Amino acid sequence: KFDFASGEVTNDDNDWDIAFRGTSILVNGGSATGLAEEPARSGQGAAAIADGTFASVVSTGALTFSQDSASGPAIIPGSGNGWYNYAGAPTYLISPIPGKILVIRTRDGALAKLEILSYYKDAPSMPNAFSDQSQYYTFNYLYNPNKNSSSLE
C-alpha cells in the first residue's frame, strides 16, 4: 500500500491511497473486488487513466473516475487494458504502456498522478522476467494536496 501524502509505503489499514496486488492496482475507495488478501477500503479514492506524457497531463479535465467494485478494480487489469502489456512467450515481460498516466483521487479527496516506469525490482533497463524480481513498482508521481483543485501540476 502507498500513501501519497507521506510519499511512503504503509501497512496502515486506513491511511493508504493505492495498493498493489500483482499487476492489479487498487484504490482506497469503493468495495472489494474479490482478489485474494486485498485491503479493506475506508476512503473515497477513485482512479482514471489519462493519455499523454507525465508532463502533459495537467488537469483532471474531462476524466471519468471509477472506484473498485465487485466488478473489478477501477484500473482495469489485463494486458493492454490499463497500465501494462504482457509479452507472453518467450520473454513473459510485463511492460508499462507508454503514454498511460494514472490519475488518482486519494482517500481524502486530494489528487495524484503517476507514471509507472517498471514492474521489476531496481527498474532494470533490460528486464528479464526469469531473473528479475517482479511486483516491485517504480513510478514517478505528483501529489496535489488541495482537495478543491483539478490541477495536476
Question: What label would you give each PLM region?
Answer:
Residues 103-115:
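Short coil-to-beta-strand transition motifs
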Residues 1-100, 122-126, 132-153:
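N-terminal "domain-start" segment
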Residues 108, 118-120, 143:
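A mature extracytoplasmic/lumenal domain signature
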